[in-house]
Amino acid sequence: MSEAPKRRLRSEHWFNDPAHADMTALYVERYMNYGMTREELQSGRPIIGIAQTGSDLTPCNRHHLELAQRVKAGIRDAGGIPMEFPVHPIAEQSRRPTAALDRNLAYLGLVEILHGYPLDGVVLTTGCDKTTPACLMAAATTDLPAIVLSGGPMLDGHHKGELIGSGTVLWHARNLMAAGEIDYEGFMDMTTAASPSVGHCNTMGTALSMNALAEALGMSLPGCASIPAPYRERGQMAYATGKRICELVLQDIRPSQIMTREAFENAIAVASALGASSNCPPHLIAIARHMGVELSLDDWQRIGEDVPLLVNCMPAGKYLGEGFHRAGGVPAVMHELQKAGRLHQDCATVSGKTIGEIVSSALTSNVDVIYPFENPLKHRAGFIVLSGNFFDSAIMKMSVVGEAFRKTYLSEPGAENSFEARAIVFEGPEDYHARIDDPALDIDERCILVIRGVGTVGYPGSAEVVNMAPPAALIKQGIDSLPCLGDGRQSGTSASPSILNMSPEAAVGGGLALLKTNDRLKVDLNTRTVNLLIDEAEMNRRRREWTPNIPPSQTPWQELYRQLVGQLSTGGCLEPATLHLRVIARSGEPRHSH
């Protein structure tokens, strides 16, 4: 019986196409000029891209520059040819005004590279917050065989004998400084001690959360998300990832076969169990939209709200990335969900095994870090989706609602899980910093801090500024948090139980633009509503008087972004881009360049 003819790889349309000999010669000779051979290029071996997100500008991902060597070794040993290329940098901690602008820009650039260059598959190097969604969005749009390689979290941080987490310690330290308990030098010493090595945040912030969800989706090898960056297993994972991408190419396994509706539902359940970042809903919705999968905030409410918190990691718990990894990481969390019947077990993964096969024997080694489903750290720990008479949707992360907040705001007899508060409204973070300590505002414990103009259009990009600290005077009295609300986001490392991502945002005429300081708001978690307590006539009067207040764009990309971007409720996508699905298969090969 004769073997089936070998499938012609995509790269061969560049490097070995006798029907277009002139173009083939042009493509081949330029890749030969740095030492590659015609034999290699025309061998029919898979050409594998390595999407390099590491650079001096992206410290959380910088070690990918070294890890890429292990990826290349794996690719070569599996018979492939590696080609490394840079991705537009995304550095959450240093990009101004916000790295959210870079998520969509890096996505666009990566789509063009994967579509327009002679690549048969790609290893997506991820780490810092928005590198993961940017890469997965591009993988979804192109549907080129792809696999995710996380760079992993940094080692656990310690300060004066205490475990401290990157990002999370910042919010604690700023309160200590406001209370006069530490000075600037003490603040800097404390916060920098949280980051002792290469890698992304060691807390369950956006970076670790999104890499965990990439694994839950099936787009990385089992255990990939949680291996700390300096561990030897991280290099071993890089090598295995390089080998596996070649197999995915030869078997023609594509993201559309992995990132199905059921896989996204699994990821939502995992996010709740992790106590994942509040940035996960818009990122996961964006990936799904580019994959052509219907996913909405209603799905987060329906699938994830009643899932318990299983992972005892900061900011919702007390441990960090090393403890999470040693306790079993993502597979151990999914094992608990599997036992509880909360997983689609037949979902395919890039490993070649189903989710059910991977997690069936993945027992945790530490039940103080990964709790059993039947005895969780907290019940009903997912995101709740809110609406009201001045907005359509917002989210609140229930895993970080602590006992102090619940006692103060959610425990009034006869009105449990609801409260009224006086609004203090700020026009962006500059206004907040300028006025938060103004005695004339008379801010007390029954106030809610409101910030607007920080959404996708207004900022632009949506800023992580909703988790606002109380005035220093209150902090000195022991009141270290107030309810917060806004049309922007907050850091995934924050333990603030804020009402976030309010859509539509103020800048596009959302009702948040109508709020005034001293208005009263009623927050009711039973009905999942936040209502402005003014009558309809007053609401209409304010709407007639409203005029847009959007600061000018500072760069060409900001201007273009504002014209094309949607709201956080639908993923903050560039809306025209969501119309282009699986472009490599559906649009045919790119036209020749000469």
Residue ranges and their predicted role:
Residues 2-56, 60-62, 67-87, 93, ...:
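Catalytic or ion-coupling anion/metal-binding cores of large enzyme and transporter domains
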Residues 106, 132, 467-470:
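Amphipathic coiled-coil/heptad-repeat helices and related helical stalk/stem segments
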Residues 58-62, 94-102, 122, 127:
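Short coil/turn segments at secondary-structure boundaries
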Residues 105-112, 134, 266, 431, ...:
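Well-ordered alpha-helical segments embedded in enzymatic catalytic cores
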Residues 114-135, 146-151:
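A short, small-residue-rich loop immediately preceding and capping a beta-strand
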Residues 84-117:
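N-terminal small/polar loop signature for handling phosphorylated ligands or for N-terminal nucleophile
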